[in-house]
């Protein structure tokens, strides 16, 4: 259990920094993509903002548990194991969520694809951390 918590905290910190930096760079270099977020669907009164920033840690704890349970199924060096882990998670969890989001919300395909790629990147990065720290 200690290994799950430790790797989750390490991955959470790394994902938080990368996510926050990626958001800043995304707005700076791809402002057109973020125009779609000027929509009542995405506006919040600010009372739940902390939940957004905790996302990196929530996903890291979930993925850390998943890694600890199924790590024996991923073969190869730590890079191959981390990438395969990210791909498996993306196909099992992200793809269905993106499908239902696109089909039920008033969002465009580019937005959904950016969410999928963001989630895939998070899962691969977390997988690399887990494969290195908790082989």
Give names to the regions the model predicted:
Residues 1-135:
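Juxtamembrane/disordered regions of integral membrane proteins
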